[in-house]
Each structure stands twice: as structure tokens, then as C-alpha cells.
Amino acid sequence: MKKVGIIVGSIRKNSLSGLVAANLANVLKKDVEVEFIEIADLPLYNQDYDALEVQPAAYTRFRKQVKGVDGLVIVTPEHNRAMPAALKNALDVGSRPWGQSAWNNKKALVVSQSPGKLSGFGAATQVKNVLAFLNVHTIAQPEAYLAES
């Protein structure tokens, strides 16, 4: 059975992104194994860590989880027309050390939500741009934006 990792871009307890992700997980569980990949415990990325023989435990756990799934669903809110800092940090952590990216050749669906009328379009676009650089193949159509949520 295929395995899908779900990353919630908000680290706020009881966030709407978390609720959306939980509902998506319930739907997906019918066809695939689902694993939530936590990002709240990731220390802020620092390139000095790349030179360490032993990486922070949260980095190791996160990278192993990303490498262990066949595809990803990233559910993100929008903060000031951009992805949340915690999500950008997770993308950076998974991409390092150089040449050892956990993201390489993964497939992903990006879902965004926001209380505004643009429904997280800015955040989703930003996430997709970073994922493209990381060699993650995003699902282009259909797009999933939840406005005024």
C-alpha cells in the first residue's frame, strides 16, 4: 500500500490547517496509509548543523519520515501572503545537508486556506515554487484553495 505523509504548515494548536489535514487524512485512509509528519519541534535551520556528525534528533526523525513516504500532502495557512515560517524551516531542514535532500523526486499536493478571499493563494504559490526547486513534483490540477475559512 502506498504511504502519504501529511505536513501541516501551522504549528498552532487546533489550527484550521490541522483540521483540514485531519479531514483529508480520513478520506485518504480508504486508499493509502497516512502518516502525519510533525514540524513544530524542528529547531530553526542553521547551516552549521550540516557539518556536525550527529544532527539534531528532530532533523533526523523528520528527514527519515519524508524519505519514507511515497507522496506528500502539505496543508498550509497564509501569513502575510506567504507560507508560515515553520513550514519554510521544514522545507529547508529536509533539503539538507547538500546533496542529501529528503524531498528529491517526491510527489506532493499543496492545499492552502486563509480567512481572506484569496484563500492562501500566495502561500500555496510560494510553497510550490520552493518545492519545484527541491525537485518535488506538485499536482498542478485541480488546485485546492479554501477561501474565507
Regions found by a protein language model. Give the residues of each.
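Short, glycine-/small-residue-rich phosphate/pyrophosphate-handling segment
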Residues: 103-145
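Acidic, glycine-rich active-site loops and adjacent beta-strand->loop/helix elements
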Residues: 42, 78, 112-115, 148
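N-terminal beta1-alpha1-beta2 submodule of the flavodoxin-like/Rossmannoid cofactor-binding fold
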Residues: 1-97
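Glycine-rich phosphate/pyrophosphate-binding loop and the adjoining helix
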Residues: 1, 46, 137-149
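Short, intrinsically disordered, mixed-charge
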Residues: 92-99, 129-133
